[in-house]
A protein has these predicted regions:
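Catalytic cores of eukaryotic secretory-pathway lumenal/extracellular enzymes that build
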Residues: 1-201
Length: 201
């Protein structure tokens, strides 16, 4: 939250919907990180939780008609003016697609001396695209495909068949049109979202 607010071009326009599944209620701490942004917060004891999809369905219930949705995992770093960049990319795609979704698996990072460090060389000539993982095959005991992010030498948008639950940016109405299935625990989450998003345009 702190990084998102610090690097946003318009932090006052941000609304965070947080479903906190830790033992202690951290609303005051998280609210103090929000600055001019708003916080909608639900605390659930880890004993009472039912998995990531259930938590994300609860997070979707915090939606109040905002223009855009950015769904991320809690382990995330942001680029400067990330909010304006996402809106600009989405707006450009809107000219060719009625309901564009920007989605990928973001770079991982590590902490060194208390500071986050991305150890991958980031190129301004490639786009990070979701592709099926080569070590994945459908089987009777495993009906879930795995995907990974790969660099493609283009800076133009690449159509995809998959969405990443840990980074998904689109119109806010996605919340109402493609609600989360709270009965899924983890596997199948992204395939369910991708198929339903496709069939809804």
């Amino acid at each position: 939250i702190k990084d998102a607010v610090a690097k946003a071009k318009a932090p006052e326009s941000l609304v965070f919907g947080v479903v906190d599944q830790t033992p202690e209620n951290r609303r005051p701490t998280l609210a103090s990180l929000c600055g001019p942004a708003k916080l909608r917060y639900v605390h659930v004891s880890p004993i009472e939780t039912r998995g990531v999809c259930w938590a994300r369905s609860v997070a979707f219930s915090l939606y109040q008609g905002e223009d855009f949705l950015l769904q991320i995992d809690s382990h995330m770093l942001f680029e400067q003016d990330w909010d304006a960049q996402l809106i600009a990319q989405w707006t450009a795609l809107k000219a060719t697609c009625d309901k564009p979704i920007l989605s990928t698996y973001p770079y991982g990072f590590e902490f060194e001396e208390g500071q986050p460090v991305v150890k991958i060389n980031i190129s301004d000539q490639t786009t990070l695209v979701l592709r099926p993982h080569p070590e994945t095959a459908l089987a009777d005991d495993n009906a879930t495909l795995r995907f990974r992010a790969e660099h493609v030498f283009t800076r133009t948008p690449v159509p995809g068949c998959h969405v990443a639950g840990g980074f998904l940016f689109t119109e806010g109405r996605f919340v109402d049109e493609i609600p989360y299935d709270p009965r899924l625990y983890f596997h199948g989450e992204e395939q369910s979202l991708a198929v339903r998003a496709y069939t809804h345009g």
